[in-house]
Design a protein with these regions (language model features):
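Accessory RNA 3′-end/elbow-binding domains used by RNA modification enzymes
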Residues: 1-41, 45, 66, 185-292
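The conserved catalytic core of RNA pseudouridine synthases
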Residues: 26-32, 49-50, 138-172, 176-177, ...
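Structural signature of FAD isoalloxazine-binding scaffolds in flavoprotein oxidoreductases
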Residues: 61-76, 139-153
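Acidic, low-complexity central loop/insert segments
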Residues: 62-116
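Extended alpha-helical targeting/anchoring segments
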Residues: 120, 124-149
C-alpha cells in the first residue's frame, strides 16, 4: 500500500462503457495492488462503486448486503435480450401512459419474486449465467425473493415512451428485471436504457470521484475513507493501550455483557483495529486489520 493510505474505503464514480474491474484496476497506482469491492455495476451503468484497500478487503461482507439506490431510465414499447441497451432490441410498437405506469409500480414494490436476467453473474450449475447466455444456450434463472423499498416514477415522456424512475432496493435486486417486469405489466415490453447507482448504504456518489481523476491527479485522499466507515453500523468499543496489544495478537477482551453480534474495536485515534464476535461479554477477534 502506498505511503499515506492504510486500509480503507474508496468511493468511485464509475463512468459508462467500462467494466467495474477495469475501473478498479486504474486505482492500483494510488492505493496499491490489494483492492476489493462491495458489488459491481454493469458496463453500461454509472455511479457508485465501493472499493476496499489493503486489509480492509476483508470487510466486504459488511457492505455487500447494504441497501442501494438507483436512478434509471426505462424505454417502453421495446424489449432487449439482455434487458439493457447492450442486447438485441425488438420493438413491439405498443404504447402506454403515465397513469398505467404509476398504477403498475405498487406491484413491483415490497417483497417480490424476481427472475434475474439471463445475462447476469448468477451461478447456474457452477457457471456464471452470462457465459451460458453468450454461448447461445437457453438459460433458466431461478426466481428469488427480493426487497424493493421504493419504486418511484419521476417523469414520463409520452412521445419517447421513456420513464425516469428512482429505485431503492435490497441487495440482490436487479433493476434491469424491474424494468422488464414493469413493461410486461403495462403490456408494452420495456428495457433499461440508463442506470446510475447513487447510494450504497450510508455512502453517496456525491462523495465519489471518477477513477481516472483519482489516478491522474493523485487525488487519492479526496476519495479515501478510513476502514471504520465501512462498519459504521456495528457497535463500537475503544481499546485501552493494553487491550490494543491483546487484540493485535488475536486475543480476547471483555465487553458489555448486553452486546450481541459483532463489534468494531477502535484505538484511541478512532482507527479500526479489528472486528470481533461477541458472546457472553467476551469479544473474540475475527478480522484483525492492524496486528500488534
Amino acid at each position: 500500500m502506498p505511503e499515506g493510505f492504510p486500509a480503507g474505503l474508496v468511493l468511485i464514480d464509475k463512468p459508462a462503457g467500462i467494466s467495474s474491474f477495469s475501473a478498479i484496476s486504474r486505482l492500483r497506482s494510488v492505493y496499491g495492488k490489494k483492492l476489493g469491492h462491495a458489488g459491481t455495476l454493469d458496463p453500461f451503468a454509472t455511479g457508485l462503486l465501493l472499493v476496499l484497500t489493503g486489509r480492509a478487503t476483508r470487510l466486504a461482507s459488511y457492505l455487500v448486503g447494504a441497501d442501494k439506490t438507483y436512478d434509471a431510465t426505462i424505454q417502453f414499447g421495446s424489449r432487449s435480450t439482455t434487458e439493457d441497451p447492450e442486447g438485441e432490441i425488438e420493438t413491439s410498437g405498443v404504447t402506454t401512459t403515465e397513469e398505467a405506469v404509476r398504477d403498475a409500480l405498487p406491484e413491483l414494490t415490497g417483497e417480490i419474486d424476481q427472475v434475474p436476467p439471463a445475462a447476469s453473474a448468477i451461478h447456474i450449475d457452477g457457471e456464471r449465467a452470462y457465459r451460458r447466455f453468450r454461448r447461445g444456450e437457453t438459460v433458466t434463472v431461478p426466481t428469488r425473493r427480493v426487497l424493493v423499498h421504493s419504486f418511484t416514477l419521476i417523469h414520463f415522456d409520452s412521445d419517447s415512451q421513456q420513464a425516469t424512475v428512482s429505485v431503492r432496493c435490497g441487495s440482490g435486486t436487479y433493476v434491469r428485471s424491474l424494468a422488464r417486469d414493469l413493461g410486461d405489466l403495462v403490456g408494452t415490453g420495456a428495457y433499461l436504457t440508463q442506470l446510475r447507482r447513487t447510494e450504497v448504504g450510508a455512502f453517496s456518489v456525491t462523495d465519489a470521484m471518477p477513477p481516472d481523476t483519482i489516478a491522474a491527479a493523485a487525488a487519492g485522499a479526496c476519495a479515501w475513507f478510513p476502514a471504520s466507515t465501512a462498519v459504521g453500523g456495528l457497535q463500537q468499543r475503544q481499546l485501552t493501550a493494553e487491550e490494543r496489544i491483546i487484540v493485535g495478537h488475536g486475543g480476547r477482551i471483555a465487553v458489555d455483557s448486553n452486546w450481541v453480534d459483532d463489534v468494531a474495536l477502535l484505538d484511541d485515534m478512532g482507527d479500526l483495529i479489528a472486528i470481533a464476535a461477541v458472546d457472553d461479554g467476551v469479544a473474540a477477534p475475527k478480522i484483525v486489520l492492524v496486528p500488534a
